[in-house]
Regions:
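DNA strand-break repair and replication-stress modules
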Residues: 1-201
């Protein structure tokens, strides 16, 4: 399929992503990525937790995507195809429905940190930004309302190689995606939209 794309020089984003042969990424997942994120230049540089914001993409698939795009050899293949003139004809801005889901609470839950449930993630997000959370000593986490055992699990996770950097990189990526979201183009219509109302009495 990659050879066919290379020969035709023109393709869709979903077809291109599927052709890359990423583990666990079938046609439906490739279509979802294309629909929700819209641009190869964005997708190929996202850390894996961001992929969990796409409907029906769980941790295993998100990690497979992140692992694929983290490999310099895979990025080089993409670069070569683009340099040879392959063009993706249906790129677009990310789906605006992503906006409300791109927050620190969602990110902390998506990172699969031990003992950090969605409720605890929301609790942390109300007290810290990403950098402050990385810098927070255990007693500050407890003061923010976490049980000592949960705070200890978070500190242990942050101390593991690469995890703090992943959190900060993912928070930056959230901000980047939010900045690419299109402004709302339509105002929701009310139940009386288009109707004539006559008030009497």
């Amino acid at each position: 399929l990659l050879a066919a794309i290379d020969a035709s020089r023109h393709t869709t984003l979903a077809r291109f992503l599927y052709a890359l042969g990423i583990q666990h990424v079938g046609e439906s997942t490739a279509k979802a990525l294309a629909q929700w994120l819209g641009d190869l230049g964005l997708i190929r540089h996202l850390p894996w937790p961001l992929f969990r914001r796409i409907p029906d993409i769980g941790g295993e698939v998100a990690r497979a995507l992140g692992h694929f795009f983290d490999q310099p050899g895979n990025q080089a293949v993409i670069d070569r195809l683009l340099e040879r003139g392959v063009r993706i004809g249906d790129s677009h801005a990310p789906d605006p429905r992503l906006g409300p889901t791109l927050d620190l609470a969602s990110l902390l839950a998506d990172l699969e940190i031990p003992k950090i449930t969605p409720v605890r993630a929301a609790q942390l997000a109300s007290a810290f930004n990403a950098q402050a959370l990385v810098d927070a000593p255990l007693h500050n986490l407890v003061t923010a309302g976490l049980p000592t055992e949960t705070a200890g699990a978070l500190v242990g996770w942050l101390d593991a190689p690469g995890n703090a950097a992943l959190l900060l990189r993912s928070a930056d990526a959230q901000a980047r995606v939010r900045g690419l979201l299109p402004a709302a183009t339509a105002v929701a219509t009310g139940p009386l939209e288009g109707m004539t109302v006559v008030l009497t009495g």
